[in-house]
């Protein structure tokens, strides 16, 4: 069975386009908020997962402080937790809501929040 001339022209074109790199527009996910943001994280992270606990209403700064660079902790050894301003350090970091809900983010930005 021979292919029609139309299919013979379309099949190579489809194969060529499927190998082309995505444009900047297709890599940008747009504004993702709430459930849309969580669903996008599930897709971006896959089996690696990401940190999300819908039962927590407030950010647990004690758990997040464990992820601060060791150098920061060593520089501030002599001070107690209240005076080193862990909350200020965390506020200065760009969060996923600011990055993907208030602004546009890409799939690569989402992958930064995977485990």
UniProtKB/Swiss-Prot annotation:
Disulfide bonds join 33-101, 45-114, 100-105. Transmembrane segments: none annotated. It is found in: Secreted. GO terms for molecular function: hormone activity. GO terms for biological process: glucose metabolic process. Coiled coil: none annotated. InterPro entries: Insulin, Insulin-like, Insulin-like_sf, Insulin_CS, Insulin_family. SMART domains: IlGF. GO terms for cellular component: extracellular space. Its main location: secreted. It comes from the Eukaryota. Residues 60-92 form a propeptide. Residues 1-26 form the signal peptide. It holds the Pfam family Insulin. The keyword Signal applies. Insulin decreases blood glucose concentration. It increases cell permeability to monosaccharides, amino acids and fatty acids. It accelerates glycolysis, the pentose phosphate cycle, and glycogen synthesis in liver. Belongs to the insulin family. Heterodimer of a B chain and an A chain linked by two disulfide bonds. This is Insulin. The lineage of its organism: Eukaryota, Metazoa, Chordata, Craniata, Vertebrata.
